[in-house]
């Protein structure tokens, strides 16, 4: 686990395949990281297949996201709340949905991402 990692409440880790969280990774509440899969064939379902989950630096994973075995999430990526991540996420990419799809890519040095802070009536 990297430095400055934040894990919110209700997260579940099934880690037989290994989980690596890069520096500054932020997990919203109720995130599920599962690193074990099994065969579809009923006769072979008792055979399990572990695969690691890896996040780069400064990754933000929204609330109630599920990440399946073998996924790598690149530096600075953002995963929208409620998403199911079944494929690798490139660095500096926003993904969301079931299954998660690319919403947009961004350059952290030049793109302005909107704040998640909602203004009140008193804010100007």
Mark where each language-model region is:
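Flexible, glycine/small-residue-enriched loop-and-beta-strand segment within the central core
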Residues: 1-72, 98-99, 104-116
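Acidic, glycine-centered active-site loop in nucleotide-sugar glycosyltransferases
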Residues: 90-91, 96-99
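Leloir-type glycosyltransferase catalytic cores
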Residues: 117-124
């Amino acid at each position: 686990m990297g430095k400055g990692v934040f894990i919110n409440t209700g997260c579940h880790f099934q880690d037989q395949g290994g989980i690596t969280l890069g520096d500054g990774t932020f997990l919203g509440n109720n995130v599920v990281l599962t690193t074990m899969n099994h065969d579809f064939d009923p006769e072979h379902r008792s055979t399990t297949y572990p695969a690691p989950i890896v996040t780069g630096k400064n990754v933000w994973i929204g609330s109630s996201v599920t990440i399946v075995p073998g996924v790598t999430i690149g530096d600075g990526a953002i995963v929208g709340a409620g998403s199911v991540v079944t494929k690798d996420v490139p660095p500096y990419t926003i993904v969301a949905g079931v299954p998660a799809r690319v919403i947009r890519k961004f350059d952290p040095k030049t793109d302005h991402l909107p704040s998640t802070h909602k203004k009140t009536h008193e804010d100007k």
